[in-house]
């Protein structure tokens, strides 16, 4: 107590009384504004809630919510089950696979009580805490599966919004989410995601929660979660499912509440090497399945952000177009550029009459001076007629690469059939 008083006195001496009070008021106002935004994005009005409950779907879309349990705190479990019971979409089942130990028999009691009241809740007590999610999937009867962790909560419209996308042909759906502590009003972070991007997913698992997918995507898989990817099983699962999905849809709404507490993954920010290794293995396996080969690396200093050094299929001629060069010594610029460029063979088309003192047997220099009436686009369009390269790089004469493998870095993406244009940071 004495040390606390000393700290307060020291703070008052340093800042006075007014500044801390003003800062506290500003923080309270900011929190109120943030809460308004949160409510705007994730709460629904009574009329909308009623409309969702009364909407009739032509298709019989049954969603099985899969939840593995292990020593789940009583209040967390009740909140989870109630969040599913409160769904505005009613064609669901909740599959609870319980691997809790004997000291947590209350988990079984609570689940059985709810299951007796609502037949849509299916509970199984497992003989051991292993493969709970996989086992729950085996007895699920829905054509679509949603994944809900045992200490989290669903937004009341979560299944309705997913069912709407399923009706429109989606077979893999993911939503935005919000981290919270004891109640959803006590939020700590809102996670608004981008739409599906293969390359972003290969760099980190940004999809996370809430995920609903068609059961047919599991065809040919022995299990959803693989033991060999323990530590990054969710990441491996998302990679495998999205490979097979035909229509992936992102719902830009907060439909999942991810609880933050002392024992949760959301609170544990430490990097575990086995999890990093498992993630790299999951990405490598994904590349093998898609026949896109490369080396997976950690994008240091961030160990859980990954980058792929794709193998080059071959070494085609790359044409580099240089324009807007304000230097009189274009030859000096090209010489410096070549020293900073490891890749060969190259073809350089430049806006000049001649280039001197550039000798490299694997580099062809083509001079194509720009007319005064031509803009850059017109010049490049005409210059292309002189090139023989399979790939084309347009480079301002004011730019210089910072790494010698800059062409390889761009080429390894450009060679992919699903990529048309590649750009770098300047």
Spans of model-derived segments:
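Hydrophobic/aromatic residue at the end of a short beta strand that borders the catalytic acidic motif
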Residues: 148, 153-158, 179, 233, ...
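Short aromatic/hydrophobic "clamp" motif used to bind/position activated sugar donors
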Residues: 145, 392
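Acidic donor-binding segment of Leloir-type glycosyltransferases
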Residues: 85-125, 338-371
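Conserved donor NDP-sugar-binding/catalytic core segment of glycosyltransferases
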Residues: 157-188, 399-426
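Conserved nucleotide-sugar donor-binding catalytic segment
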Residues: 197-284
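Short, flexible, basic/aromatic active-site loop/helix in glycosyltransferases
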Residues: 185-206, 424
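N-proximal low-complexity "stem/linker" segments adjacent to membrane-targeting elements
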Residues: 22-83, 292-336
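Glycine-rich, basic loop-to-helix element that forms the pyrophosphate-binding segment
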Residues: 125-140, 370-387
């Amino acid at each position: 107590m004495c040390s606390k008083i000393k700290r307060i006195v020291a703070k008052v001496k340093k800042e006075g009384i007014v500044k801390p009070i003003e800062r506290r008021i500003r923080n309270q106002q900011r929190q109120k504004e943030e809460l308004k935004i949160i409510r705007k994005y994730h709460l629904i009005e009574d009329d909308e809630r009623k409309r969702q409950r009364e909407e009739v779907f032509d298709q019989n879309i049954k969603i099985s919510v899969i939840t593995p349990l292990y020593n789940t705190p009583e209040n967390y479990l009740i909140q989870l089950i109630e969040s599913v019971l409160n769904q505005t979409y009613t064609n669901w089942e909740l599959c609870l696979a319980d691997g809790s130990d004997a000291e947590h028999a209350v988990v079984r009691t609570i689940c059985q009580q709810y299951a007796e009241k609502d037949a849509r809740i299916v509970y199984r007590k497992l003989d051991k805490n292993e493969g709970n999610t996989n086992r729950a999937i085996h007895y699920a009867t829905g054509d679509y599966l949603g994944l809900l962790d045992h200490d989290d909560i669903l937004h009341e419209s979560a299944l309705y919004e997913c069912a709407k996308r399923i009706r429109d042909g989606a077979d893999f759906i993911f939503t935005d989410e919000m981290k919270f502590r004891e109640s959803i009003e006590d939020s700590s972070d809102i996670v608004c995601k981008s739409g599906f991007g293969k390359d972003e997913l290969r760099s980190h698992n940004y999809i996370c929660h809430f995920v609903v997918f068609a059961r047919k995507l599991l065809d040919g898989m022995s299990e959803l979660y693989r033991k060999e990817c323990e530590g990054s099983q969710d990441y491996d699962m998302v990679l495998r499912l999205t490979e097979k999905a035909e229509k992936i849809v992102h719902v830009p709404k907060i439909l999942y509440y991810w609880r933050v507490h002392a024992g949760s993954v959301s609170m544990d920010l430490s990097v575990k090497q086995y999890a990093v290794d498992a993630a790299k293995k999951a990405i490598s396996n994904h590349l093998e399945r898609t026949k896109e080969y490369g080396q997976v690396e950690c994008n240091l200093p961030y160990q859980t952000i990954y980058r792929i050094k794709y193998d080059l299929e071959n070494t085609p001629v790359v044409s580099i177009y240089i324009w807007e060069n304000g230097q009189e010594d274009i030859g000096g610029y090209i010489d410096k550029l070549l020293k900073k460029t490891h890749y060969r063979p190259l073809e350089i088309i430049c806006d000049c009459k001649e280039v001197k003192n550039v000798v490299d047997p694997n580099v062809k220099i083509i001079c194509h001076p720009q007319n005064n009436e031509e803009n850059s686009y017109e010049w490049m369009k005409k210059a292309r007629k002189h090139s023989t390269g399979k790939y084309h790089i347009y480079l301002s004469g004011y730019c210089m690469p910072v790494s010698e493998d800059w062409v390889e870095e761009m080429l390894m993406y450009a060679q992919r059939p699903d990529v048309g244009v590649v750009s770098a940071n300047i």
